[in-house]
UniProtKB/Swiss-Prot annotation:
Record-linked PROSITE patterns: RNA_POL_BETA (PS01166)
Organism: Aliarcobacter butzleri (strain RM4018)
Stated name of the protein: DNA-directed RNA polymerase subunit beta
Lineage: superkingdom: Bacteria
Chain's gene name: rpoB
Membership in a protein family: Belongs to the RNA polymerase beta chain family.
Purpose of the protein: DNA-dependent RNA polymerase catalyzes the transcription of DNA into RNA using the four ribonucleoside triphosphates as substrates.
Catalytic reactions on record: RNA(n) + a ribonucleoside 5'-triphosphate = RNA(n+1) + diphosphate
UniProt GO BP: DNA-templated transcription
Cellular component terms per the entry's GO annotation: DNA-directed RNA polymerase complex
Subunit annotation: The RNAP catalytic core consists of 2 alpha, 1 beta, 1 beta' and 1 omega subunit. When a sigma factor is associated with the core the holoenzyme is formed, which can initiate transcription.
Example of a GO MF term: ribonucleoside binding
Keyword annotations: DNA-directed RNA polymerase, Nucleotidyltransferase, Transcription, Transferase
Amino acid sequence: MLNSLKSGNRLRVDFAKNPQKIEIPNLLQLQQTSYDTFLMIGQEDRTTAGIEKVFKSIFPIHDVQNRLTLDYLGSEVGKPKYDVRESMVRGLTYSIPLKINIRLTLWDLDEKTGEKIGVKDMKEQSLFIREIPLMTDRTSFIVNGVERVVVNQLHRSPGVIFKEEESNTADNKLIYTGQIIPDRGSWLYFEYDSKDVLYVRINKRRKVPVTILFRALGYSKEDIIKLFYPIVNIKIKNNKFLTEFNPDDFMGRIEFDVKDDKGNLVIGAGKRLTARKAKALIEGGLKLIEYPLELLMDRSTANTIYDPESGEVLFDALTNLDELKLKKLLDLGFESFDIANDLAVGIDASIINAFKADAESLKLLKQTEQIDDENDLAAIRIYKVMRPGEPVTKEAAKDFVKKLFFDPERYDLTKVGRMKMNHKLGVNVPEYVTTLTYEDVIKTVQYLVKVKSGHGHIDDRDHLGNRRIRAIGELLANELHAGLIKMQKAIRDKMTTLSGTLEDLMPHDLVNSKMITSTITEFFTSGQLSQFMDQTNPLSEVTHKRRLSALGEGGLVKERAGFEVRDVHPTHYGRICPVETPEGQNIGLINTLSTFSKVNDLGFIEAPYKKVVDGVVTNEISYYTATQEEGLVIAPGSTKVDENGKIIEPLIEVRKNGEILLMERNSVDLIDISSQMVMGVAASLIPFLEHDDANRALMGSNMMRQAVPLLRPSAPVVGTGLEKIVARDAWEAIKANRAGLVEKADAKNIYIRGEDENGAFIDHYTVNKNVRTNNNTSFGQRIAVKEGDFVQKGQVIADGPSMDKGELAVGINAMVAFMPWNGYNYEDAIILSERLIEEDAFTSVHIYEKEIECRELKHGNEEITRDLPGVKEESISHLDNSGIVKVGTYVTPGMILVGKVTPKGEIKPTPEERLLRAIFGEKAGHVINKSLVCPTSMEGTVVDVKVFTKKGYEKDDRAVAEIESEKAELDLKHHDKLLMLDREEILKINDLLLKATLTKDVELDDVVYKKGETIPVDVLNNVNRFAMKKVVSSYSKEIEKAYNDIKEYFIKQKAHLREEHEEKLQILEHDDILSSGVIKQVKVYIATKRKIKVGDKMAGRHGNKGIVSNIVPKVDMPYLEDGTTVDVILNPLGVPSRMNIGQILEVHLGLAGKKLGNQIQDIFEAKRADFIAELRAKMTEIASVAKLMNGKAFMDSLNDEELVQYAQDWAKGVRFATQIFDGVKAEEFAKLFELAKIDSDGKCVLFDGKTGEKMKERVNVGYMYMLKLHHLVDEKVHARSTGPYSLVTQQPVGGKALFGGQRFGEMEVWALEAYGATNVLKEMLTTKSDDVEGRTKAYRAIANGENVPNSGVPETFFVLTKELKALALDVEIFGEVENNEQ
């Protein structure tokens, strides 16, 4: 059982009712495994890697004359040049080199026949193809220094799909279609038209009758008829048309009188033929019955009928019979003939109609092409539809049709597509055949005919059995394939153009890898699925990597996606989260995987279930895809079960094929693994989610991803138990790889010593500080263990941002009151207490990067310097000698961060300038100050500076100093690691010797140890490393060998460490890679502390968002009877209409947690002698409220030190976990309220902070988890005085980024019109907008203290006149004409 009080590095009371049997799978495993199977780095056998399959699908490449062959032998991947951190800082791509081994074979050809007769020459070569971006251990990619994520794509699975759609032409008529969708190649659509003719389209081109396709595939008319119609043999006897009596032909009411061959009535029209009657008729000798003439008149012949005398064709196959034709058959004495029975059950006349439709077009083609064979004509017809206007021969047309669907190079269904085809059509084609077969095409049309007659099943395209996931490995393989196809074409073209001797030809002369480079670069930089990683907090990062997008190449287009695709489908249950999706135009197109779901090898999402046998739940857990779960009866996770696993209630609510039904317990096949399995990670973090409206839950889960990491994060008092899972799988936290004892821990390193099957070891972990993330939040890790602590494998040893004791912590537990307060919380506004600001509760640190480049220009190079023209000394006092700001400087808007000068263009100097140059040297006057200045609305401390210099240019003092300090840090780290290796070596040797006995006497520190004794550990610890060899010689040969092996191993480890260190030092010495034209680049990192202020956006976890409207002094806030002031006041009207009642329950449980925490704090403060026993009793009492927890046994198993440590955490508030759909019940709430001494309605008496009077009503007060979102007022508000103007209209530009103004729009104009404020309105539309002359005059008048003159003509008016002139209209402005005349 996985349920435990432990959650991360703390205790949490979990109220789950059903024991958890399965660990939540790693949240990032989909991305990781997909990329690993694509590249298979570090594995000996890489033949099954995705990348190998791609290359093998392209090679070998032959030229047209068969002179050359290029074969692929295998690929190799190298090591990355820079590590992840370096790549990000330097703005490079974290990648590995890919090489392929290629063999070029030159063939000896027979001069006469041109056939190969032997090998002339063979050359092998290893070619560098390109750098492939490498996935980091946190499943992201670093592209050009920016961290990106490749989102998984949810697309239509290849295979066959049948649909019904409403006809565009005929009213209420349904049109049936069948589509064969490949992964690569031409789509095949089969569709009925309104006249019931069956057509086929290839790639949405013009439709042709389906029989044209069959004929192009080589089927004759008779073959096609036999495939689609039952053949009925009509016998002619006594001028009557007879057929064999078959009872199956008479289902339902009979439409005509059934007569025997003698003309006697057997069954009258309108009656039914029962099985008993049929049997009696057959036994009575009924063999032949009359075929009604009126039915025979409209039937068609099943094969060609020849004249018995002349042997000429009398009637073609599919000739429609009529009175004359039947008479002819009688006259010529035919005994029998065959007809196609299109009246049989599950059959229609669509194929016959298609033959009729194609007859006309083939007749015309016959005349133009002068070819008689109809099959050849059909192939030409398809060629002409696909490539209109091109001349064609019959051989080329046949070859074209064949290649379209049956050539593996052009057409690929993939293994998935083949599996879906076999499943749907009931064919048994081997799964390695990934092209179409003739059988596939025939069976698809046969099934479509069945669907039309109501005997087949229509597919649901939104069913998860028809949609699959393409993860990074497959997406990358597709991109690589696209690039290789281009390369293959280029190689073939090159081979064709080669002439003369080919002896000197090498593989690299043919292969040009530019095509691959461009496709992969494009995919990672501008592809729709490669996205800038959302790194606001660990949750946003984890959910971004679990995202499923229906958009992207080969996916949907959001403008055309309808409601059905976006909607929640029953098969999403346990596979895709029904809650977490963006609001707006992408709603439902971007989804997230559910918590427990996995993706199988074929790309289908699977959900886990426990098997149920005869109403008893077993412990067997299996994963099912949406297709596998069809027809099974599934019980929900909250079903009540007794201790033996038997379902208690005889009738339970179950799911079957997406329907909710009531069924008996014995008919249940499966049961949900957990009540959490329905939702995704973010939604599962919302406690009491089941009490929230879905719209608000959606907002809640989306807003948790926007919460900025706080300076002092605190895990929620009311959690769901999933907080530790997010922390476990987010890379931000450092987890122990192996269990052991913390040997050393400082601000930057943790060393853990332990033992495994190979003996003692010491693991090293690096702790990051003040790193800038993609979203400008600060990334810092805090050590969560101390020296001497014992840690388990996977335990969090350092918390990342937004983490607290190994749990996700995106906000703060604040005391909340639901009440109006002087109108300040109108419309969801939030009132805060000043206490939160004093205690830095909602303070966050943001790091911004500013960069400046020095370029090579025509008239000299730009330069970074302190020597700036026209700048006072005090303005640059914070810069160092190189002109770069010093680390630790507090900068404010307008301060110079990096001094830079740019040479002016060469202008002939005036005599004065020449004199100045003569006096002051070259510099004076011909450079402009182009320094990097701290932008408006940004102030903070400079935390880091990076300087990069191009090869061949001298590094300045600052760059040299940076390198020296980094070197010193690397040396220190290296020294530490060496010390730890020495320590590990001694531990392993001591380990070895403690288990062995001496084979001869040895003297140590004047003490003689006899043969057969063991030297004590404290003595061994004091033995000098160099004297150890002598001691070891007193042991057996095996021990001596083992000792030498240990020494050898550590010598290698130290050498490896030294190499690693040297490499890092070399990278430091390396010249930096900068883009062309750039000679130097400086990056300055500024850290800003943002306290919460009025205008910031805050939210709870239930979609209850609002803006801070007022920050009130602590003394003015309402307070409780014990004097505790409230932290946050929310509007009670925000709850009923939004229907997110979960927040009220959270507040109640939070209050209980805090009150119980206070009781534990009281025990600490009382300092009684037996306080540990008291703590144990109190904590056991609280933990025992949850049934599954077995609180007493757990508390008793803790030693005193551990108990006190956990109690100190609980003193700040007892932590609860209430799982979604399986949380706290009413009786548990009552028990907790009783323990915490809270009134049963959860309300408190409040006093007004200003007057001290008791409030009239009791108020709902408690603790809610509040988040501060990244919509910060400091980054939104700006004010423009004068600034840039738009070029054409001359109006001020818009937006903060461009320092723009606020548009005075149409509605604002109406407002001024309504008030009759004429002059204000005129000023708004002219002087303040686009009257160019007027605004200059107004500025001058204001500057000189004069009256503002009248406004002129707005620029927009001139633009309008110019546009009218462009339409050849002579437009002149009335005033101007008069002026010209005067």
